[in-house]
Amino acid sequence: MEKPAGRKKKTPTPREEADVQKSALREEKVSGDRKPPERPTVPRKPRTEPCLSPEDEEHVFDAFDASFKDDFEGVPVFIPFQRKKPYECSECGRIFKHKTDHIRHQRVHTGEKPFKCAQCGKAFRHSSDVTKHQRTHTGEKPFKCGECGKAFNCGSNLLKHQKTHTGEKPYECTHCGKAFAYSSCLIRHQKRHPRKKP
């Protein structure tokens, strides 16, 4: 036997569902019967795999002045809060916290310049120096003075320029007291002072 032809149940649109939820919230606020939503509690599985790989663990032990203490059950506990700077330059004695900084510094002594400009072949110790240098080829000047609008290819040049607006002259001659905005100007000035003969 066939079912009598009747109306099909209409599925609500997302907008209609949202309207129903909003009106239910309004009713809860008016009645004051609102309860916090229940969250299902899922038990967590204990972690079986180690948090750090052996290489990472070795790095952590190298980067920290590791100290151990016994907890209340006599088990040694690693305390990684006392940082040290384990990388010392064998040439000049400078100390570095990170191995990468130590490696970069070594290039000062070895003269190694592994980063080259693709356009002119000029070599640099650091990749950031190549980026700055390439602006001389492209003409890019991303650092603009907020006071006068003059643009510079290097942030340090902008900082130097801004002293012209502030009038700051932090470099003072020890012989005569004259002040300069730039250290290079002070050095040039000091060469003009007669040297004392012993």
Swiss-Prot record:
One of its GO terms (cellular component) is nucleus. A zinc finger (C2H2-type) spans 87-109, 115-137, 143-165, 171-193. InterPro entries: Znf_C2H2_sf (IPR036236), Znf_C2H2_type (IPR013087). GO terms for molecular function: DNA-binding transcription factor activity, RNA polymerase II-specific; RNA polymerase II transcription regulatory region sequence-specific DNA binding; sequence-specific double-stranded DNA binding; zinc ion binding. Residues 13-38 have a biased composition (Basic and acidic residues). Residues 1-12 have a biased composition (Basic residues). It holds the Pfam family zf-C2H2_4. Its main location: nucleus. Residues 1-55 are annotated as: Disordered. The keyword tRNA processing does not apply. It is found in: Nucleus. One of its GO terms (biological process) is cell differentiation. A putative DNA-binding regulatory protein associated with meiosis in spermatogenesis. Belongs to the krueppel C2H2-type zinc-finger protein family. This is Zinc finger protein 41 homolog.
